[in-house]
Amino acid sequence: MKTTAEIRQSFLDFFHSKGHQVVESSSLVPENDPTLLFTNAGMNQFKDVFLGMDKRPYSRATTAQRCVRAGGKHNDLENVGYTARHHTFFEMMGNFSFGDYFKYDAINFAWEFLTSPKWLALPKEKLYVTVYETDDEAYDIWNKEVGVPQEHIIRIGDNKGAPYASDNFWAMGDTGPCGPCTEIFYDHGDHIWGGLPGTPEEDGDRYIEIWNIVFMQFNRLADGTMEKLPKPSVDTGMGLERMTAVLQHVNSNYEIDIFQTLIKKVAEIVGTTDLGNKSLRVIADHIRSCAYLIADGVIPSNEGRGYVLRRIIRRAVRHGHLLGAKETFFYKLVPTLIEVMAEAGKQVKEKQANVEKLLRLEEEQFARTLERGLILLDAELANVKNGVLSGEVAFKLYDTYGFPLDLTADVCRERNIAVDENGFDKEMEAQRLRAQSASNFGMDYTSIIRVDGETKFEGYTNVESLAKVTALFRDGKAVESVSAGQSAVVILENTPFYAEMGGQIGDSGMLTANGLHFDVKDTQKYGQVFGHIGELTQGTLSVGQIVNAQVDAQRRQYTKLNHSATHLLHAALRQVLGEHVAQKGSLVSDVGLRFDFVQPEAVTKEQIMEIERLVNFHIRANHPVLTEEMGVAEAKSKGAIALFGEKYGETVRVVTMSPFSIELCGGLHVERTGEIGLLKIISEGAVAAGIRRVEAVTGEEAINWLFNQQTILAQSADLLKSDIPSLPEKIIQLQDKVKKTEKELQQLKEKAAMQAGSDLAKSAVKINGVSVVTHQLDGADAKVLRVMVDDLKNQLGSAVIALGSASGGKVNLIAGVTADLTAKVKAGELVNVMAQQVGGKGGGRPDMAMAGGSQPENLSAALIVASDWLKTMI
């Protein structure tokens, strides 16, 4: 019986034997594709190739792509573990043709791999295929060429209410590449319920789709017209877990080897013998998605990708709690995961320490509130009358205890109770940006400039070149010429201008010819061409014209300083903080650099100093900065670090600054590190959960920054009548003096309050025989108000007191009730009556409660409302 790892390797070996390039799985974080939250299909990494915006050195490819399908509030997460085939993480085997082979080969390849005794040897009589209703070509290939009998071929038409809206017609979007598809199904046997595709029983588990082959042969225009593509392509997907279930003769994906090993390990760790418990399946699934997401740079947080990861982790932790886990357990599954994933586990193994650390920290954080949240939820569920948990309670669990909505829904599902999601949405309105980041990932690919050919980049050695204008664009539309005063994007056949990539800003400069001047303000890359963005200030510029392209050399030099310094900074961060440090983003400009990186804990001042010291040591060492092109495998063997979010071809450019820093990089750099002069870190802090940011300046900017700091120190010393070395001691003396003065002032305030309290006791009024004091004391802080309430209680013996003060645009409120009256009046209720009038809220004990507010102009009205309310309560 083949293992999952063997089936994965067999697929890749088969297609390699058919002339396909074996391409590594791309990251779960889509590279340069903001339309996607996570990689969810094998074709994602080839999207630009299918769109004609990218070219590869091969026309056939095969992959074992890691995928995650979980995101947004409305998803299948709650079904994972409860059905046979729902997963947050899965592997999609795929083979792709980029204008190479088409239907005949794609169909025959799939059939050979599935049925040949050399490969999977599936019984042909167990296989059924579907084709798009009008795709006679695919039908005939299956029937006449492959030999599949007619009764095993099903035509599927437009079954989704619109033309070309069908299970057997695939489209990338409303416009763009699209085409019919053919799907292959496996019959698990009549002992399992379910019907053939296209029948009312098709959702059963008897006939399971194992392979989908998409024929991209049309380009759909905005008016719905279908144009034939000049070079049709093929995109296929075979679910590895589903295929393994077929070959291992089981009906559920959770019964295959990798899941059974994980399930048994979970049971061992949490101490259960019930291997059929669905919570084990949930945890076994979730460790795969969580470990690979963290390995690919995602950090648990409250927004976007990080929030999806947090939801999955917390769901797993909750199911561990159901199984009786008494301590952190989730991270302990990582070694077993690496083992069962075999070759595909190397991504997690390389980041194992960081993966385990982040999983443990997240579980520990959630464990602090999980028990209390479940107690609240259990109490609320016991009181549910109509079978629906209120959205208000669901939101409180989210806001106070960190329960994602789907976790609450998971618990409710076990009690056959629904959740009022509309009510939850209303409560979430003020925090709508959380968990909605997924919907903000969008880009209209039709607006991107497309030009055939490519621009030859000459900027590694030149800052000036003669170049031919191959295209001009205004407002996204191609034009033949541009006149003075007009903005445009100029495409050149060759250019010394660097287009923004890898965090480095695009070059600026000018294009000139006789009587012509075009100011280049930025340079961007569109597919394989460079767009020079700017304004024509003089003359007329036309397609076909020869111009002199001249980069702003000084701006570029400053940018080069910062780019090389960024490499040294990255290396220093990894050396001081640990190898878990990975780039999450960067900005390299002519005025400074910004570097975002993975770091779950705050960076200490001592660590910052050591990082800065290391960088400047290697600057002073004046290392040569060497660039070399080589294969990806060779670069990795030399220890080269790849940067986050960048795509690399088969040949990569490696930038080396002694053994200290070796990175893959296509950017511009100095010739020796000594040119950088100096690096000064000017800020460091958190930008998101688990992500830190360092900002720094170099060269002349660093010197200017230090001069400015020196000036500030000198001015501060003058103000304090001190010299600079004595400033810390002088400031400490000043702080001590201020503290002493503040203490004396507080004592005076309290003394005055005691006197005022005596006067207020005389102003008490009787409401139904109870002494009541309501008064406004502007300038009194919360501490003074507490002293006054205690004093009034002592003087009056039995009383209700409501005091308020306004200062600096803020309101302080306090309510006090003597013990004999708390059965009638509670201080917390009284203070909230007042707080509502001043835009605040508060709380406390029945005998003493405080509140704040932001509307001092309503304070007098609040005290009147308090008196009126007391008349109804006493």
Swiss-Prot record:
* Record key words, sorted: Aminoacyl-tRNA synthetase, ATP-binding, Cytoplasm, Ligase, Metal-binding, Nucleotide-binding, Protein biosynthesis, RNA-binding, tRNA-binding, Zinc
What's the superkingdom here?
Answer: Bacteria
InterPro entries reported for this sequence? aa-tRNA-synth_II/BPL/LPL (IPR045864), Ala-tRNA-lgiase_IIc (IPR002318), Ala-tRNA-ligase_IIc_anticod-bd (IPR018162), Ala-tRNA-synth_IIc_core (IPR018165), Ala-tRNA-synth_IIc_N (IPR018164), Ala-tRNA_ligase (IPR050058), Ala_tRNA_ligase_euk/bac (IPR023033), DHHA1_dom (IPR003156)
Q: Where in the cell is it found?
A: Cytoplasm
Q: Which GO CC annotations does the UniProt entry carry? A: cytosol
Molecular function GO terms recorded:
alanine-tRNA ligase activity; aminoacyl-tRNA deacylase activity; ATP binding; tRNA binding; zinc ion binding
Which Enzyme Commission number(s) are on file for it? 6.1.1.7
Where is Zn(2+) annotated to bind?
Answer: 563, 567, 665, 669
Cofactor(s) required for function per UniProt:
Zn(2+)
| Cofactor: record remark | Binds 1 zinc ion per subunit.
Catalyses: tRNA(Ala) + L-alanine + ATP = L-alanyl-tRNA(Ala) + AMP + diphosphate
Q: Which GO terms describe its biological process?
A: alanyl-tRNA aminoacylation; negative regulation of DNA-templated transcription
Q: Which CDD domains match?
A: AlaRS_core
Aminoacyl-tRNA synthetase as UniProt keyword:
yes
Q: What's the record's remark on domains?
A: Consists of three domains; the N-terminal catalytic domain, the editing domain and the C-terminal C-Ala domain. The editing domain removes incorrectly charged amino acids, while the C-Ala domain, along with tRNA(Ala), serves as a bridge to cooperatively bring together the editing and aminoacylation centers thus stimulating deacylation of misacylated tRNAs.
Q: Which PANTHER family match?
A: ALANINE--TRNA LIGASE, CYTOPLASMIC, ALANYL-TRNA SYNTHETASE
The job of this chain, per UniProt, is described as:
Catalyzes the attachment of alanine to tRNA(Ala) in a two-step reaction: alanine is first activated by ATP to form Ala-AMP and then transferred to the acceptor end of tRNA(Ala). Also edits incorrectly charged Ser-tRNA(Ala) and Gly-tRNA(Ala) via its editing domain.
Say which family it is in: Belongs to the class-II aminoacyl-tRNA synthetase family.
Query: What is the name attached to this protein's record?
Result: Alanine--tRNA ligase
Q: Which organism is it from?
A: Actinobacillus succinogenes (strain ATCC 55618 / DSM 22257 / CCUG 43843 / 130Z)
